[in-house]
C-alpha cells in the first residue's frame, strides 16, 4: 500500500480520484493500492515551555531542551492556549494511514514551506518508511497521472 500526503483536502481528493482511491474514510481516501490523506496546513508548531512540563521558566533553567521541539498547533480559547482538537484528530488519522503503508509519497507544495510541512510531520510521527516526492504543477488528470508515473517520483535526497 502507498500513502500519499497532501497539504490540503481538495488536492488530496483530486489526486485520490485520478488514482482510483474512491472509497471515502474519515480524513483520507483509499482504494487501488493507495491511501491518500491530507493536512490542514501547518498542524504542528514549536513547543512552548509548558508543553515539556515546565510551568515557570527562570534564567537558571536555560538552556531549555524539550523532548521534542514540535507539538500540535495550539489555539486560543477562553481557558488559554489549548491544543487544536481538529489538528490532533487529523494527525491521528495521518499516523494511522502512514503506519498502514510501505511507502510514503509527499505531495505537499513543491516549495520550501510544503517541504518543511511534510518533513516536520514525518519526523513528528517518527515515520521510518521510504519517502518519494511528487512534483506536480497542476491538478488536471493528465498532470496527476504523469506526475505519479515512476519517472516523476524522486526519492528524498537527504535523510529524513
Describe each model-derived feature in a short phrase.
Residues 1-154:
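Intrinsically disordered, low-complexity regulatory segments
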Residues 155-160:
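A short, hydrophobic C-terminal helix/tail in secreted or cell-surface proteins
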